[in-house]
Amino acid sequence: MQRTRLAEGNLANDLLHPWALEADPKVKERNRYINVQAFANCRIHLRVAEGECDFINASPITLEDSVTGEGRKYIATQVGCAFGINHMRFCLPINQGPKLGHLADFWHMVFHESKEVGVIVMLTQTFEAGREKCAQYFPLDTEQASMVLLADESDVLFDESGQTEPGVLGRVTLLESTFDAKSRSEIRKLELAIGSESKIVWHFLFAGWADYSKPEGSDRQALLDLIKLSASKSSPDNPRIVHCSAGVGRTGTFIALDHLLCELESGHLLNLEPEADPVFKTVDQMREQRMMMVYNEMQMQFIYEVLREQTDRKLGKITGWNMDSPNGSEERSAKIAKLNDPADYLPTSKPELEAVPDRSHTPTRSRSGTPELPDPVNE
């Protein structure tokens, strides 16, 4: 079904088609990967002045709560394209040179799409296996506690006469930074200020998940703890902003697990018809809203494995039966018949995503391991 959607989207000449893709060069150059785009009719629109490009590679994802009928909301995105310093706008760490990409656009989205409190879940390192996976878009520590959002005339909030700092629209400031051992996550409490308004943003960086893979061992339980922890800082109707590198593989897997575990906790998954497959249904619904969500079979299998394990625990918690007993095994298999056979989901290799060609110099590493650009004055 995904191949059919992508083929239809590529061939569609009508932007009203549900899976149409925009061909504008300004849109294409804002994608980190050539083959991962947001559908034209299911994407976040930046609030910019009329005539300016409002594209950001971010898709609103809504999955229905089967009990209440209300939508669980997320935003799947990617951060920081491999652009040079002359491309539109960027963030400046205090006393540091500019970093790569449309980072101010990302923070604008966080500001406008979040409610009173923003929640960001980051499932990638900035560098993995020697490759840049994500731009450094947030303050790392107290030595670089603030990042400036540079003003641009395309901003709807831009008011040159009201600027207290020339050329500065806002800033991201680190208030607290901790490491949660249970969820194996770096947790940062940030203040995002744009214009005269500000809000708190919680940022979770999970380090236990390499690209194209699945968490193993204790990292698996840590991911489940992160799902609960990030949910506790938000509400179902306040979209958690989730990203990895491309915003489809690890991102889609996280969102699917969050939704399905909520469905399990409510009891809905324990009352399904034997032929029902909630994992397939959820992934298919996500792929209708953003291409390639849950990128490979290994990640698909991982969702089945986790849901099977958590269903076992749920049944044990409810009935008090022994999971290792023969009767317990029969009851378990009857309840989760569609979740208990990984044979159809053996991992197979898929090609790596193709990055947009770098239009700037190859970045060097800073003290923190994040990329730096040469001084533009010397170019």
Predicted features by range, described:
Residues 1-379:
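Cys-based phosphatases of the PTP/DUSP/CDC25 superfamily and their flanking regulatory architecture
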